[in-house]
Amino acid sequence: MIEMKNVKKGFSDDFLWGGATAANQIEGAYLEGGKGLSTSDFAAYKDPYEKGKVNNFTFDVSSAELKRYKEQPDEFDFPKRRGIDFYHRYEEDIALFAEMGFKVFRLSISWARIFPTGLEEKPNEEGLAFYDQVFDECAKYGIEPLVTMSHYEMPITLTEKYNGWMNRELVPLFEKYARAILERYKDKVKYWITFN
């Protein structure tokens, strides 16, 4: 039997206490700052407990649904377009993380905020500047950003034109995006995850 006096209490100094989010879940501001539409912007709310549905937790969207969502957007609720409004409230959110003692904050960068359609030659400076501000705010509190490049979303144009990752044409487009953010944030981000 283990004696309680021998059980270590608390975390070691090198333990990375923190939390995780995804751009498509928290940012909101889906058409602000030059951001283009992403696949997550078309994840309409579906009641997961709707009678007669076996599994309504998926965010799969058919071509017919996408067409309807684009033609009649006011008839549907797209919660990821709002998120928690991190885009406008990141300063107070990061201050709360610091209050909780976070040492690390795992977040993702929205590909559509950096390359609105995924096809642009140059990145969207307004989108890059937003993440500069987020990383600077983290640094202010000594919080280490751990950044995911792709967290279940991409510019909707790439799914419409190439059928997403089903087409290898996406590889150089993703590489362009990855190189842009790796170069831009090389002095602000030490830890990267390619795909969630």
Q: PLM ranges: what are they?
A:
Residues 2-124:
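N-terminal structural segment of carbohydrate-active enzymes
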Residues 54-68, 72-73, 92-196:
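Substrate-binding cleft and catalytic face of glycoside hydrolase catalytic domains
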